[in-house]
Swiss-Prot record:
Listed Basic and acidic residues bias regions: 179-189
Impact when changing N488I: In CMH6; severe
Residues given in the record as ADP 2 binding sites: R302, K402, S474, K475, F476, D477, R501, H530, R531
GO aspect biological process, one term: glycogen metabolic process
Protein name: 5'-AMP-activated protein kinase subunit gamma-2
Post-translational modification comment from the UniProt entry: Phosphorylated by ULK1; leading to negatively regulate AMPK activity and suggesting the existence of a regulatory feedback loop between ULK1 and AMPK. Glycosylated; O-GlcNAcylated by OGT, promoting the AMP-activated protein kinase (AMPK) activity.
Length: 569
């Protein structure tokens, strides 16, 4: 009976549409429609909403706001065929990434085409697909050690500079994501810590060089697309002045395989080679010469920049060559004390030695390329090139042939190997093979110093009576005279002077003219020496190959660099 009464009430409500029951029923209908609209949309688009948070978990929130606040996939939904409620955040939110994404500067290259899949996608993965510097460690702005010493070079090398440059847009698609599988193991991170950009090894994937679709670019750093425009903007007239004095025999060398090492050096700055932590000793010109050389020995360094307080600038370098020149000029006999070494100040010695022919200190900016550094070292016939910040005036590091070649050798296995690396020394003609200066084991030290000064060389092979190379006496060995305070007696023999290193000396590092250049480079870098003695089958001296000879062959000779008639300032 209860059921009959219920049916009667239902009929009464239906038969009287103008009554209160009719109004209540209409409101119920309207409410039911509101409830079921989001359910239909969720079933109609299961891939969009169902894969995000679950189809039944937030159905009440989907009624009022179809887009979850802060969802990274709002930009994708706005492109769907379904009519969506307009929202001020539905269209322009694509560049906004999740908090863990390192890139926010390339919205333009991804608004051209919508993603193929409507599923949730990570923005970091999207940006990584067309930018080689997408890893968190490759962004200088997020790297903890990115601006430790010289923030200016880090800013100019980052992607955040001029993202709208047309050159960058055309080069974004040159390097696909697949090139990352050839990424080297970043040995520089272990050796140089954060001193070099984390993306340096990624530029030299073999697939990048061999890609037939690589567009020709005017910049010598065309194989590094993500930093080409930044490097071009960073090189000002002061840094690029040296390269303007170079001529190239053939412009095609820029794209040839033989110029791969030259392009490597052009794409890296001097700051990239500066270690995270190193020792740099600076001398004031009012310091006594004797104390300065003792300080070199105590700190284990071979050279130091000279600071003049009157000019408030660096005016030169004090090296072991200065020590040799002082001994060569003022040594008389073991009975006469070298007064000039004991009492002279550095500024006094410079005035006497240079005799008013003062030349400005040859230095280089941390923003200059390593190609500039190699050219400056070889052209000026110097062995040490101070890196000085032009803004603060601080000395950051001292570049050498040895350091530059070691940096280059770290990446050689990841670059295409030029054909000349498989040629031997005889075919390439690298080294010095005529008028070789040498000494004997019983040669006095003072005579060896005279040869250093007159021939302007840095090492002398020691040859016995049979002509066999048994040792080598270099300029660096002369500083041991200051360490042992035996510089007042230069009549001792070379053998006696070299006894201090007999315990750890492993012998002369040698080679022959039939060995290929690749073997020579590997041997001189591993041995950490400045030269190799070229010998024949009888172990007799044939020639000398130095670090400058190797850098000339690897970098400058393939570039066809010529010095113009004008002098470099």
């Amino acid at each position: 009976m209860g059921s009959a009464v219920m049916d009667t009430k239902k009929k009464k409500d239906v038969s009287s549409p103008g009554g209160s029951g009719g109004k209540k029923n209409a409101s119920q209908k309207r409410r039911s429609l509101r409830v079921h609209i989001p359910d239909l949309s969720s079933f109609a688009m299961p891939l969009l909403d169902g894969d995000l948070e679950g189809s039944g978990k937030h159905s009440s929130r989907k009624v009022d706001s179809p887009f979850g606040p802060g969802s990274p996939s709002k930009g994708f939904f706005s492109r769907g065929p379904q009519p969506r409620p307009s929202s001020p955040m539905s269209a322009p939110v694509r560049p906004k990434t999740s908090p863990g994404s390192p890139k926010t500067v390339f919205p333009f290259s991804y608004q051209e085409s919508p993603p193929r899949s409507p599923r949730r996608m990570s923005f970091s993965g999207i940006f990584r697909s067309s930018s080689k510097e997408s890893s968190p460690n490759s962004n200088p702005a997020t790297s903890p050690g990115g601006i430790r010493f010289f923030s200016r070079s880090r800013k100019t090398s980052g992607l955040s500079s001029s993202p709208s440059t047309p050159t960058q847009v055309t080069k974004q698609h040159t390097f696909p994501l697949e090139s990352y599988k050839h990424e080297p193991e970043r040995l520089e991170n272990r050796i140089y810590a954060s001193s070099s950009p984390p993306d340096t090894g990624q530029r030299f994937c073999p697939s990048s060089f061999q890609s037939p679709t690589r567009p020709p670019l005017a910049s010598p750093t065309h194989y590094a697309p993500s930093k080409a425009a930044a490097l071009a903007a960073a090189l000002g007239p002061a840094e690029a002045g040296m390269l303007e004095k170079l001529e190239f025999e053939d412009e095609a060398v820029e794209d040839s395989e033989s110029g791969v090492y030259m392009r490597f050096m052009r794409s890296h700055k001097c700051y990239d080679i500066v270690p995270t932590s190193s020792k740099l000793v600076v001398f004031d010109t009012t310091l006594q010469v004797k104390k300065a050389f003792f300080a070199l020995v105590a700190n284990g360094v071979r050279a130091a920049p000279l600071w003049e307080s009157k000019k408030q600038s660096f005016v030169g370098m004090l090296t072991i060559t200065d020590f040799i020149n002082i001994l060569h000029r003022y040594y008389k006999s073991p009975m006469v004390q070298i007064y000039e070494l004991e009492e002279h100040k550095i500024e006094t010695w410079r005035e006497l030695y240079l005799q008013e022919t003062f030349k400005p200190l040859v230095n280089i900016s941390p923003d200059a390329s390593l190609f500039d550094a190699v050219y400056s070292l070889i052209k000026n016939k110097i062995h040490r090139l101070p890196v000085i910040d032009p803004i603060s005036g601080n000395a950051l590091y001292i570049l050498t042939h040895k350091r530059i070649l070691k940096f280059l050798q770290l990446f050689m296995s990841d670059m295409p190997k030029p054909a000349f690396m498989k040629q031997n020394l005889d075919e390439l003609g690298i080294g010095t093979y005529h008028n070789i200066a040498f000494i004997h084991p019983d040669t006095p030290i003072i005579k060896a110093l005279n040869i250093f000064v007159e021939r302007r060389i840095s090492a002398l092979p020691v040859v016995d009576e049979s002509g066999k190379v048994v040792d080598i006496y270099s300029k660096f060995d002369v500083i041991n005279l200051a360490a042992e305070k035996t510089y007042n007696n230069l009549d001792i023999t070379v053998t006696q002077a070299l006894q201090h290193r007999s315990q750890y000396f492993e012998g002369v590092v040698k080679c022959n003219k039939l060995e290929i250049l690749e073997t020579i480079v590997d041997r001189i870098v591993r041995a950490e020496v400045h030269r190799l003695v070229v010998v024949n089958e009888a172990d007799s001296i044939v020639g000398i190959i130095s670090l400058s000879d190797i850098l000339q062959a690897l970098i400058l000779t393939p570039a066809g660099a010529k010095q113009k008639e004008t002098e470099t300032e």
